[in-house]
């Protein structure tokens, strides 16, 4: 039996998902552990590593303007999609292509003379 999605999820978290996918998210999305929000970060990787950021233009959980500002501060390569908070579910192919682009960029950098791969092997 399909469980109806939570109204808040349907309207504000995954508003661009099908009702079946909303139901799946509702059934499987766990609560955020408080330690995640309260644990200080000692070193943010984006200070020293290339970053990629998917901006969800129709996100109702995190302001898209805040997402853009964060990506800019990180110096991240961005992909803006007209999606809810869950672009990986509503537009998985576009998100996957972006992840593949990021991985290919890292691999190319690592293999270049003086790149990360040479440094790690040396």
Predicted regions: what they are:
Residues 1-6, 33, 70, 111-117:
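Flexible "cap/lid" loop of the alpha/beta hydrolase fold
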Residues 1-43:
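Helix-rich cap/lid subdomain of alpha/beta-hydrolase
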Residues 30, 48-49, 74-77:
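Short glycine/proline-enriched coil/turn segments at helix->beta-strand junctions
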Residues 47, 52-55:
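Short beta-strand/loop motif that positions the catalytic acidic residue
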Residues 76-122:
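Catalytic active-site module of serine/aspartate enzymes centered on a nucleophile-bearing elbow/loop
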Residues 57-82, 101-102:
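Conserved loop-alpha-helix segment in the C-terminal half of the alpha/beta-hydrolase fold
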């Amino acid at each position: 039996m399909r469980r109806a999605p939570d109204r808040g999820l349907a309207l504000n978290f995954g508003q661009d998902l099908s009702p079946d996918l909303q139901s799946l998210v509702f059934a499987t999305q766990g609560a955020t552990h408080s330690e995640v929000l309260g644990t200080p970060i000692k070193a943010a990787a984006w200070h020293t590593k290339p970053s990629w950021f998917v901006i969800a233009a129709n996100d109702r959980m995190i302001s898209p303007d805040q997402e853009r500002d964060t990506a800019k501060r990180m110096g991240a390569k961005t992909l803006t999609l007209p999606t809810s908070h869950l672009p990986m579910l509503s537009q998985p192919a576009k998100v996957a292509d972006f992840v593949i682009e990021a991985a290919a960029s890292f691999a190319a950098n690592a293999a270049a003379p003086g790149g990360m791969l040479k440094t790690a092997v040396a």
